[in-house]
Design a protein with these regions (language model features):
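Short hydrophobic beta-strand element within catalytic cores of glycosyltransferases
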Residues: 264-267
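A charged, aromatic-enriched C-terminal amphipathic alpha-helix characteristic of glycosyltransferases
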Residues: 17, 305-332
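Conserved acidic donor-binding segment of nucleotide-sugar-dependent glycosyltransferases
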Residues: 279-290, 297-303
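Membrane-proximal helix-turn-helix segments that form the acceptor-binding/catalytic region
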Residues: 76, 91-111
């Protein structure tokens, strides 16, 4: 059996959650000796896609009657792998599937999602294809703390003081930047801590309220766009806190990597899958911005205990080998029953 693992965005988009998911899938298949290709026009027995932008590419395996798997809702921070639209209507966040995402998913032989709540969300939004739950694997070796050279990259790249604590936040640049106050208010009270906000730069980042937020933030808040993988990984290895201040669903890939890097997770409830994280056990989870700010400050002041050990133990069970075997079981089932 041979598998097509397909995700080929423009170079501008090929350095975020989609690229890391592709690397994870390929790594899992390599660990168990499963052959794969990235060439859409090669010969293969099953095709694995992960982006709504590739809807038109499904024509090739469909014409060949090759089973198609689509991984969905794992990389929602990445525009190239984002399946959802988020709109604020009357003060309430409305989440819907992108039209092209719905078309893609309903052409699939099988859809893979990371949690039961993700499955329910797809069904509520009109997905009729079979859906299975599988949590992506993590290459724990990429977050090995013995690699001092990798830890040093962050300090060389940003010229930071090694004695300062680091808070890393993941989000997006939107017109209103909902939730960003939880990060900024924490930074205002801890000038001795450096706060980094990482997100994919959009048109909104240069205009309106988003630009005002960035300009008015304290000097210890640094707004950055997506970084090269080695720099981002080094940042994770040095971060004391990984924060999700926004309301939109975040990418499970980024959350898993923060767990593997032993960062303390402080996240908004709506930004994560409830099945992955448990409040006060593997993360600190809150609904409102004031509580997120307080949790961040309390952790930095050692007033609340870390949940990093339990989070690392949980993420360790999602290793590449197990992920590879689960994928191959699904691939074989589709090939056998086509």
């Amino acid at each position: 059996m041979k598998v097509l693992v397909y995700f080929q965005p423009s170079p501008k988009h090929d350095n975020f959650e989609g690229a890391r998911m592709r690397k994870t899938i390929k790594g899992a298949l390599e660990v168990i000796g499963q052959k794969y290709t990235s060439n859409l026009y090669d010969e293969y027995d099953v095709a694995h896609f992960m982006s709504p932008e590739d809807e038109s590419k499904l024509a090739v395996p469909l014409e060949r009657k090759v089973p198609i798997i689509v991984s969905a809702l794992f990389g929602e921070d990445d525009p190239a792998t984002r399946f959802l639209n988020h709109k604020n209507k009357g003060g309430k966040l409305i989440v819907t599937l992108k039209p092209k995402a719905l078309r893609l998913l309903n052409k699939a032989s099988l859809v893979l999602v990371p949690s039961e709540s993700a499955k329910e969300l797809l069904i509520e939004n009109g997905v009729t294809s079979p859906i299975d739950i599988i949590v992506p694997g993590v290459n724990l070796a990429r977050f090995n703390f013995s690699r001092e050279d990798e830890k040093e990259l962050f300090y060389r790249y940003f010229r930071e003081d090694k004695n300062k604590k680091i808070v890393l936040a993941m989000g997006e640049y939107t017109n209103n930047m909902n939730g960003i106050s939880s990060l900024i208010n924490a930074a205002k009270k801890r000038e001795d801590v450096e706060f980094y906000y990482i997100g994919y730069e959009t048109f909104a980042a240069n205009y309106g309220n988003c630009k005002r937020v960035i300009r008015s933030a304290p000097k210890n808040v640094h707004f950055k766009t997506i970084l090269p993988d080695d720099i981002y990984r080094s940042m994770l290895l040095n971060a004391d806190v990984f924060m999700l201040p926004g309301y939109s669903l975040s990418g499970i890939i980024s959350v898993q990597e923060a767990m593997a890097a032993n960062c303390q997770l402080i996240v908004r409830d709506s930004a994560v899958y409830s099945e992955l994280l448990v409040n006060e056990k593997t993360a600190y989870i809150a609904d409102n911005s004031e509580t997120l700010t307080s949790l961040c400050l309390d952790y930095l002041d050692s007033k609340i205990k870390p949940t990093t050990e339990e989070a690392y133990n949980k993420i360790s069970s999602y290793n590449l080998e197990n992920f590879g075997h689960k994928l191959c079981e699904l691939y074989n089932s589709l090939v056998t029953n086509k």
